[in-house]
Amino acid sequence: MVECTPGYDAAMGSRAEDWFRPAERDVQHARRSLEAGTFEWAAFAAQQAAEKAVKAVFQALGGEARGHSVTHLLAALPPAARPGGELVELAKELDKHYVGPRYPDSFPAGAPMDFYTEAEARRAIDASEQILEHCRRHVLR
């Protein structure tokens, strides 16, 4: 579920860059995790980057969003900022990496590190970077 607040305290100003900068850092963290072979953390950091980037768009548009599903966050954007179907499909893939990389009970046995592959982490990072690029156009004008 996504909770959107249409408006913000003008005295506070937009916090769009405050959300987007950590999104960029999370992508960097994802790349470093990929290089280190911690593929589950690379996937999680990629998901976090996309989530924060979309929340930055809400801020840039004078709103706020709560929730963790990148798919639902994208769907809640106003039509002018909403991406096409390809990015929504990538968001669906990223949403799978919100819980799984962190908790062993996401799998029938073993730890998350036993299930994540380099290819999967690379796909997550690529998906995240594409979503960040879309969001960047709405945040950094």
Spans of model-derived segments:
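Terminal alpha-helical segments
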Residues: M1-R141
